[in-house]
């Protein structure tokens, strides 16, 4: 027993922060494309880097709505800002994409616990600038997690999430068996409760579009469906048949997403 206790203490010590190291992988370099603007926000003595771009419909007129997008775990804002902004096509929408703390020009450590306050601070600054205009939140994979957190804690006009993980559940149920939960347990415990997507989905009331890849091996569909089933607001679920985690939408998927984004925009701007 005396020999076991030090071994357990050593394991728990080395396991501290392992959730951050296993989940977050900040890329070293990224270049933003044309038409992209860079902003920095000050929050709690740290810098949050945000990249913004406008949809084709907002190039020559002010935006009627805004979208706050969150990236995946191996992605920076520069990688996706032009693409996600362009998806709104003729709808006049300005998109903001945040670099998480420790990513790009955002200061602070790349830790899960640093993501929720940065997400809310960015939303609050966007709300200050947007005034009464609607704000959507969006994210793919890990990005869906802070998107749902914001949707549960701030007024948003709509939510778009793709391949959403239920991180704690997935760590526990998918990975616990092969290490007798000796690694899975501390990793699951280190995921902040603010990033419990199932709990946040239950509190989110805005209309949502949820895309599920039914052959996803990174976030198996049963965990994605757990988030989708928990979502409290009105929702449209788009199942991508035969799609993996990184699969691009096929023509049918694009058409369904386009229709769903029209639905969100029209609802948010009706009478505006």
Functional labels for PLM-detected ranges:
Residues 149-200, 206, 250:
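Hydrolase active-site cap/lid region
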Residues 8-42, 48-56:
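An N-terminal hydrophobic leader/cap segment in hydrolases
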Residues 225, 229-272:
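C-terminal catalytic histidine-bearing segment of alpha/beta-hydrolase fold enzymes
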Residues 83, 196-197, 206, 220-229:
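Short alpha-helix in the alpha/beta-hydrolase fold that links the catalytic acid
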Residues 138-143, 147:
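Gly/Ala-rich beta-loop-alpha elbow adjacent to hydrolase catalytic centers
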Residues 203-205, 209-212, 216:
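Short beta-strand/loop motif that positions the catalytic acidic residue
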Residues 48-125, 145:
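Membrane-embedded segments
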Residues 214-219, 246-247:
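Acidic catalytic loop of the alpha/beta-hydrolase fold
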């Amino acid at each position: 027993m005396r020999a076991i206790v030090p071994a357990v203490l050593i394991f728990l010590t080395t396991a501290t922060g392992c959730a951050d190291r296993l989940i977050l992988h900040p890329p070293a370099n990224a270049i933003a494309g044309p038409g992209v603007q860079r902003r920095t926000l000050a929050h709690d003595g740290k810098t949050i880097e945000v990249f913004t771009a406008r949809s084709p419909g907002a190039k020559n007129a002010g935006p009627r709505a805004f979208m706050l997008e969150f990236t995946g775990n191996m992605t920076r804002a520069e990688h996706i800002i032009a693409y996600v902004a362009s998806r709104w096509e003729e709808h006049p929408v300005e998109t903001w994409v945040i670099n998480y703390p420790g990513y790009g020009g955002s200061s602070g450590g790349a830790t899960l616990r640093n993501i929720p306050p940065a997400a809310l601070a960015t939303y609050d600054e966007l709300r200050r600038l947007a005034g009464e205009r609607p704000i959507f939140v969006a994210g793919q994979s890990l990005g869906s997690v802070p998107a749902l957190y914001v949707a549960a804690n701030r007024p948003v006009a709509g939510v778009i999430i793709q391949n959403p993980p239920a991180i704690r559940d997935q760590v526990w149920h998918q990975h616990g068996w092969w290490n007798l939960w000796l690694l899975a347990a501390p990793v699951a415990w280190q995921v902040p409760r603010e990033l419990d997507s199932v709990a946040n989905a239950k509190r989110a009331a805005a209309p949502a579009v949820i895309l599920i890849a039914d052959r996803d091996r990174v976030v198996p569909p049963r965990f994605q469906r757990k988030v989708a089933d928990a979502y409290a607001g009105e929702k449209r679920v788009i199942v991508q048949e035969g799609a993996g985690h990184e699969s691009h939408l096929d023509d049918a998927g694009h058409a369904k997403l386009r229709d769903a984004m029209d639905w969100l925009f029209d609802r948010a701007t009706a009478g505006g």
